[in-house]
């Protein structure tokens, strides 16, 4: 049997299920694949057991279990990530191991929003998940329709509290189990189809890396006699054409220059684009004026900053992290893209110390500015050893 060729004709989107333990995230994931397999061509059902025994992956030295399934609606192709345990969600969202363009928040109608429901909403906000759709699961366990309304109000309140559009986010009530067992279509199959229609409509199509402004983290700098300075790196987003003006941002004062040549595998190109490993020849900049850790970027598209708030996961001892907690005035290195910068940590009010294995909101002051936007991932290191992973939530200075 020849392997089926993957024809990508539909736009692609990455989503995931989030929510409190045992509210039905994995059952819902299985139900979506089953209902779509029966209703939209090109889908295969994945059963609960196969999603639940998610393989362990290592992302930046952190052990994370995640299950990936794929499916498609009439209008989109989806990659869907589901995690077995709460700790896996925390690590996954902070490291960006599984990118989420949107999320399906699963809440059990019988319980309403629980501590992890709230924590996942906050995490989604902190790591830059743009929006979510809610599936109110297990509605067959509620006899009183008024209770359902109360739970819905409570969920909307939690979403608004974290600056999501709580008033308008679609909340679809149903039962993942009914859908899996093929009974009570109004809360089973039909609810799942309604949910996916809401996901199609409500979760915006992500911008492709190619369509974003040009950015290339600088990995190395060479000087070529008679030609000038060449910076090398992998283009992260956008396109750079020969003759275009760019900025060198971070660490030192921002400098403008012009890309006079683009080279890849020793061949000259007229442009470099997202995903390419290139050497860019830049005009009028000395070898000693550029360094690893800066970025080459479209003018005005990104600015350097020293202070930011972040969501951080601190590696446990078993993951090779610290064996002891850290306190206020902790000064590790923050590794952004290609380089380490020392920074001072400010703990949240009322927090005395942070233990290995915790996740925490930290404010950071760097000793040198780095080109950054919210959503930028970083590692926290001590003498070259990774002790934490984080993501910029807001830029403050």
Swiss-Prot record:
One protein family per Pfam: GTP_EFTU_D3
Superkingdom assignment: Bacteria
Residue numbers binding Mg(2+): 26
Sequence segments annotated as region (G4): 137-140
InterPro entries: EF-Tu_GTP-bd, EF-Tu_GTPase, EFTu-like_2, EFTU_2, G_TR_CS, P-loop_NTPase, Small_GTP-bd, T_Tr_GTP-bd_dom
GO MF annotation, one: GTP binding
Binding site for GTP: 19-26, 82-86, 137-140
EC number: 3.6.5.3
Localization in the cell: Cytoplasm
Residue ranges occupied by any tr-type G domain in the UniProt entry: 10-207
Chain intervals for the UniProt region annotation (G2): 61-65
Cellular component, GO annotation: cytosol
Functional description taken from the UniProt entry: GTP hydrolase that promotes the GTP-dependent binding of aminoacyl-tRNA to the A-site of ribosomes during protein biosynthesis.
PANTHER family on file: ELONGATION FACTOR TU, MITOCHONDRIAL, ELONGATION FACTOR TU-RELATED
Subunit structure: Monomer.
Protein name: Elongation factor Tu
Protein source organism: Sphingopyxis alaskensis (strain DSM 13593 / LMG 18877 / RB2256)
Gene: tuf
């Amino acid at each position: 049997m020849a392997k089926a060729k993957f024809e990508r004709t539909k736009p692609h989107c990455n989503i995931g299920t989030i929510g409190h333990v045992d509210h039905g995230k994995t059952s819902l994931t299985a139900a979506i694949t089953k209902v779509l397999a029966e209703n939209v061509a090109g889908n295969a059902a994945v059963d609960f057991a196969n999603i639940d025994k998610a393989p362990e992956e290592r992302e930046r030295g952190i052990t994370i279990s995640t299950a990936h399934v794929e499916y498609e609606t009439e209008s989109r192709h989806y990659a869907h990530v589901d995690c077995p345990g709460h700790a896996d969600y925390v690590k996954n969202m902070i490291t960006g191991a599984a990118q989420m363009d949107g999320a399906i928040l699963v809440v059990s109608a019988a319980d309403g929003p629980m501590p992890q429901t709230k924590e996942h909403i906050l995490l989604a906000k902190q790591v830059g998940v743009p929006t979510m759709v809610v599936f109110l699961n297990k509605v067959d366990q509620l006899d009183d329709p008024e209770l359902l309304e109360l739970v819905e109000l409570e969920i909307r309140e939690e979403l608004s509290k974290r600056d999501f559009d709580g008033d308008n986010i679609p909340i679809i009530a149903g039962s993942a189990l009914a859908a899996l067992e093929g009974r009570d279509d109004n809360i089973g199959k039909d609810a799942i189809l309604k949910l996916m229609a809401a996901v199609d409509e409500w979760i915006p199509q992500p911008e492709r890396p190619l369509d974003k402004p040009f950015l290339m983290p600088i990995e190395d700098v060479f000087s070529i006699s008679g030609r000038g300075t060449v910076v090398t790196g992998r283009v992260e987003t956008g396109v750079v054409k020969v003759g275009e003006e760019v900025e060198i941002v971070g660490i030192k004062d921002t400098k403008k220059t012009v890309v006079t040549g683009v080279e890849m595998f020793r061949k000259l190109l007229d442009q470099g684009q997202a995903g390419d490993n290139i050497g860019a020849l830049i005009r009028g900049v000395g070898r000693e004026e550029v360094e690893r850790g800066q970025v080459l970027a479209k003018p005005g598209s990104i600015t350097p900053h020293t202070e930011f708030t972040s969501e951080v996961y601190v590696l446990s001892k078993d993951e090779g992290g610290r064996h002891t907690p850290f306190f206020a005035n902790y000064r590790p290195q923050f590794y952004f893209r290609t380089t380490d910068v020392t920074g001072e940590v400010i703990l949240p009010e009322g927090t005395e110390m942070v233990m290995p294995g915790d996740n925490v909101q930290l404010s950071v002051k760097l000793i040198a500015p780095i080109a950054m936007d919210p959503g930028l991932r970083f590692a926290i290191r001590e003498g070259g050893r990774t002790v934490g992973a984080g993501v910029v939530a807001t830029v403050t200075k």
